[in-house]
């Protein structure tokens, strides 16, 4: 998949997630954290001109923070939001994980 198409798809999937979570917000701190995560990555994706490792690291960071909030946080996602998250999750594993390059020593925990 070419860079521009990948950026467009990532932006669309995160936008879909953003729209879906608007219907299940409860005003909890985790809702605010998730919204902040989404806003940050949408801003980064919008200004990105090419797919480089810095953007891949941003996408990975977004994925890790959001995954933690959804898995262990107090978020109550409806079916639409859960489906939107699963769609992004699949995209992330198919297109981001294997392309991301980490530098320096990496230790498994």
Map each language-model feature to its residues.
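Amphipathic alpha-helical binding modules
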Residues: 64-109
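Non-transmembrane alpha-helical oligomerization segments
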Residues: 17, 27, 59, 92-95
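Short terminal alpha-helical segments
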Residues: 1-39, 100-109
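Amphipathic alpha-helical interaction modules
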Residues: 21-72
């Amino acid at each position: 998949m070419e860079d521009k198409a990948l950026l467009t798809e990532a932006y669309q999937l995160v936008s879909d997630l953003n729209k879906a979570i608007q219907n299940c917000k409860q005003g909890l701190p985790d809702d605010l954290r998730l919204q902040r995560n989404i806003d940050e990555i949408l801003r980064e994706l919008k200004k990105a001109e090419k797919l480089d490792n810095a953007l891949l690291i941003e996408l990975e960071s977004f994925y890790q923070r959001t995954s933690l909030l959804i898995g262990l946080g107090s978020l109550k996602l409806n079916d639409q939001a859960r489906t939107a998250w699963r769609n992004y999750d699949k995209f992330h594993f198919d297109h981001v994980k294997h392309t991301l390059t980490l530098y320096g020593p990496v230790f498994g925990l």
